[in-house]
């Protein structure tokens, strides 16, 4: 799997993810890009789970953002509805984090659209480790990027499905 984290702090929103792609117990690739900008660069998206499934969902989210420009929450809710009810999409195995200047969301195949309450959220195999590390650093003087990077480094030290090859994207937050 992988680990993706989003941290909202100090006027910035940072999403970071590692680059490991595993097939069973074998590392197939170490530098995959699982965090990227979508929606004309105004939204950051990251995914954990089956890569092909995640790309399908990213494509669907981009279409929803075109349909509902500037409305990340609405686009995410519409994607979650489709994901939960469509016969094909229902079988996709992935989770997504998405963020724009004002909103951070986790989107799941169960139809959940979750907004974090503590400024950080993480998904994937090392998500719990990264989230706990981020929560511990949120009240320090570290920047959002420092919190995200250090949280992923901690997760990568613990989780065998997460590596230290990070991709980081940043937006100015409201």
Curated annotation (Swiss-Prot):
Q: Name one Pfam family in it.
A: Proteasome
Identify the InterPro entries for this entry. ATP-dep_Prtase_HsIV_su, Ntn_hydrolases_N, Proteasome_sua/b, Proteasome_suB-type
For the ligand (Na(+)), the binding residues are 156, 159, 162
Q: Which NCBIfam families match?
A: ATP_dep_HslV, PRK05456.1
Oligomer and partners? A double ring-shaped homohexamer of HslV is capped on each side by a ring-shaped HslU homohexamer. The assembly of the HslU/HslV complex is dependent on binding of ATP.
Q: What does this protein do?
A: Protease subunit of a proteasome-like degradation complex believed to be a general protein degrading machinery.
Protein name, UniProt field: ATP-dependent protease subunit HslV
Q: Which organism is it from?
A: Agrobacterium fabrum (strain C58 / ATCC 33970) (Agrobacterium tumefaciens (strain C58))
Q: Which gene encodes it?
A: hslV
């Amino acid at each position: 799997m992988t680990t993706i984290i989003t941290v909202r702090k100090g006027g910035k929103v940072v999403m970071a993810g590692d680059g490991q792609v595993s097939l069973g117990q074998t590392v197939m690739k170490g530098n995959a890009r699982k965090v990227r900008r979508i929606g004309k660069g105004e939204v950051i998206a990251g995914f954990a789970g089956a890569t092909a499934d995640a790309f399908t969902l990213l494509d669907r989210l981009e279409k929803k953002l075109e349909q509902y420009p500037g409305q990340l929450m609405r686009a995410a809710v519409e994607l979650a509805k489709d994901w939960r009810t469509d016969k094909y999409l229902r079988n996709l195995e992935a989770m997504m984090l998405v963020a724009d200047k004002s909103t951070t969301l986790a989107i799941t195949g169960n139809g959940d659209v979750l907004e974090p309450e503590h400024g950080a959220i993480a998904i994937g195999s090392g998500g719990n480790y990264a989230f706990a590390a981020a929560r511990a650093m949120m009240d320090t003087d570290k920047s959002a990027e420092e919190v995200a990077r250090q949280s992923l480094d901690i997760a990568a030290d613990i989780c065998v499905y997460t590596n230290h090859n990070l991709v980081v994207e940043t937006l100015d937050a409201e």
